[in-house]
Regions:
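Generic non-transmembrane alpha-helical segments
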Residues: 86, 107, 111-115, 138-148, ...
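Active-site pre-lysine segment of PLP-dependent enzymes
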Residues: 1-11, 15-46
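Short acidic/glycine-enriched loop/turn segments that link adjacent beta-strands
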Residues: 51, 124-125, 158-160
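PLP-dependent aminotransferase class I/II
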Residues: 36-113, 118-120
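Conserved PLP-binding active-site segment of the aspartate aminotransferase-like
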Residues: 59, 129-135, 147-188
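Short amphipathic alpha-helical segments and helix-helix/interface helices
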Residues: 1-2, 27-31, 64, 85, ...
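Residue-level detector of structured alpha->beta connecting loops
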Residues: 8, 35, 116-117, 147
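Conserved PLP-binding catalytic core of the aspartate aminotransferase-like
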Residues: 102, 113-146, 164, 168-170
Length: 188
């Protein structure tokens, strides 16, 4: 960030899942020290408000001027703004969301499989990264018969088809997803 600042290059940090992490782990803790840091957040993840298509950003004042030149003040509807404001004021909802997410994620972190590993992420983050030890296994295709939506590792730099990103299921779907993973683990 410091080097980019010396070159007048802004650094943009996407914290779409930022509401799931402890505040001290946010890039926002760095903001007072840098004039080139932009941190973006979304209402679509922890707040569950994907339908309002709204987000927000933290940035130094001087970076708002270029942004004002490429956008307009009505990019977000008035009802969406009211919903977003109410969401920001409801810290209790976020605490409950983080607690429930951790509770639903725990069985996946405590379980061990022969061929599958779960990469370490915060217990409160609602995503899992599964990787099969056999690089020839296409995990996305393996999940297809179970009708479980996953994102192939090929969508991410450094990962292959033997990895998938899985959204942590709610309590009612947990057993079915765990059973599917148990069966997929048998592939080799």
């Amino acid at each position: 960030v410091k080097r980019a600042e010396a070159l007048s290059i802004p650094i943009i940090v996407d914290e779409a899942y930022g509401d799931y992490m402890p505040r001290e782990q946010s890039a926002l803790t760095l903001a007072p020290n840098y004039e080139n840091l932009v941190v973006l957040r979304s209402f679509s993840k922890a707040h569950g408000l994907a339908g309002i298509r709204a987000g927000y950003g933290f940035m130094p004042k001087q970076l708002t001027v270029p942004l004002d030149n490429i956008t307009h003040p009505y990019i977000c509807s008035s009802p969406a703004r009211l919903v977003a404001q109410a969401a920001l004021e409801d810290e209790g909802f976020l605490q409950k969301t983080r607690r429930l997410t951790a509770q639903c994620k725990r069985p996946f972190l405590e379980r061990s499989w022969r061929h599958l590993t779960v990469s370490h992420t915060s217990p409160e983050t609602p995503i899992l990264l599964l990787t099969h030890s056999d690089s020839k296994v296409n995990l996305k295709k393996a999940f297809d018969p179970f009708r479980i939506k996953v994102v192939s590792g090929t969508a991410f730099v450094g990962l292959g088809a033997n990895s998938v990103r899985v959204r942590v299921p709610g309590e009612k779907d947990q057993k079915a997803v765990l059973e599917a993973i148990d069966q997929i683990d048998l592939l080799s």
